[in-house]
Amino acid sequence: MRSLIALGSLLVLIAAACVSPTTTTAPAKEVVVPEQAKLEAAAAQYAPTDIGADISKLPAGEQQALSRLVEAGWVMDGLFLRQVWAGNEGLLLNLLTDRSPLGQARTHYFLLNKGPWDRLDHYTPFFAGVPPKPEGANFYPAGSTKADIEAWMKTLPEAERAQAAGFFTTIRRTANGKAGKPGFEIVPYSVEYQGELTRAADLLREAARLTAQPTLKKFLETRADAFLSNDYYASDVAWMELDASIEPTIGPYEVYEDEWFNAKAAFEAFIAVRDDDETAKLAKLGAELQGIEDNLPIEPALRNPKLGGMAPIRVVNVVLAAGDGNRGVQTTAYNLPNDERVVREKGAKRVMLRNVQEAKFNLVLRPIGARVLTGAQQKNVTFDAFFTHTVMHELMHGLGPHQITVAGKATTVRAQLKDTYSAMEEAKADISGLFALQRLIDKGVLPRSMEESIYDTYLASAFRAIRFGVAEAHGRGIAMQLNFLIDFGAITVGPDGAFAINPAKIKDGVTALTREIMTLQAAGDYAKAKDMLTRLAVVRPEVKKVLDKLTGIPIDIEPRFTRPGL
């Protein structure tokens, strides 16, 4: 068994990055950091755990293909490091020269966060001498402002403006500005990251030659082409059609690092093997979605009578997560791609990371349940309930209002709810996921024995999410739900401060909150959404007391990926 340590791989990637003609790395600075104990305490918020998958049943050729994909995944890791900040690579090289215990503590926490800012503490720098985290990351020129970029984009012809705002381009400074104003140019990722993407494309083509699975071969070949052409459409379609024992997600996807425009995609990789048994189990949940939509607790006119074809759901066990897929708090599931053309034609694939979820449950959620819930309800916190609710959360993102009409004009919930959208949508998926699971239990699709566990596990998981902070969408959404259900009487707080589900009111409370969120979404009611979040997305004293009891329980996991047999 070999352990994949990010440190060694990043050294290789950084060395390779130095040959890229478009790389701009800030000069290394003298680093002054907090004491070793403080850094180690910060790192202890993440519980180290081995993450791997059984690949013994894969034929030799598939195992070799998987090994090439892992190598390509590490290329994404190095690219993401550069995308976060132009100074990241120089700073890391500086850190690596110090092999003392203090130096290793510095490097460790840097790699956990993919930079010198604490992702659990509102991006507070944990090194002296570094700037605040750039909101535009390294997608835009250092020293430019959001207003500079917006003003420049307004001068562009429509086609160029679309490229400038696209997922797969950076904006760089040029000497061609006019009247003393800054000049900018559009640089495709295929040029900006040419050296690394050429290497990644070569590895994908090697993997394509090794696999005997046609849909995997097609995805790898088209994604290799995309790395060099900057056109990802065909490979996104091939990824949606992928039906293979190996499930790779690799390339530029999520846009969270671009805090200016949420436009630029960050490189990530999830290299995984499919869990066929668990994937088959989920198929029956997907088959129930139209029935759930038809019975949502909203006015019938607000329901979608035709959801369309069922998008793929995959349950996988991760072999490697890298880049944007492995920084700070780990994701447990994702919906991709983000290209609206592909989503219109093919939908979005939901991928559930089962081994990551199981690690979080054992190391974080179960211990939280033991401190938060009453003794009688602690035994009901189960991985099966946690996993099933996570699945239903992802599925419920696709149900309820999306395309709406406001003041006679067609629009979207996202556009109308603006800055409240993410928190309200996460809350909707959570609470309506409980509503949907109860319906499936009542219908006999899921066993009646799951009824208590879904609510008690949800309550324990609420405290897990609030620990991420109410400035983050998931944390705001769960705080709003928790306080609503407490006010409704569906969740009670005992004299000892322990929380409990009230069986007599929880179902009605879940239904009421599902109705309230979906109704305001259908109306595009920004004022009501803002009011709900202002009133309810807060940490009340009784919740704060419980959070204070969770000292010593990790906030999340630090995966250490293992590859037996590779």
Per-segment meaning from a language model:
Residues 14-17:
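C-terminal motif of bacterial Sec signal peptides marking the signal peptidase cleavage site
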Residues 189-378, 382:
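Contiguous, non-catalytic segments that form substrate-binding/exosite surfaces or channel walls
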Residues 388-402, 429, 434:
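Active-site recognition of the HExxH zinc-binding catalytic motif
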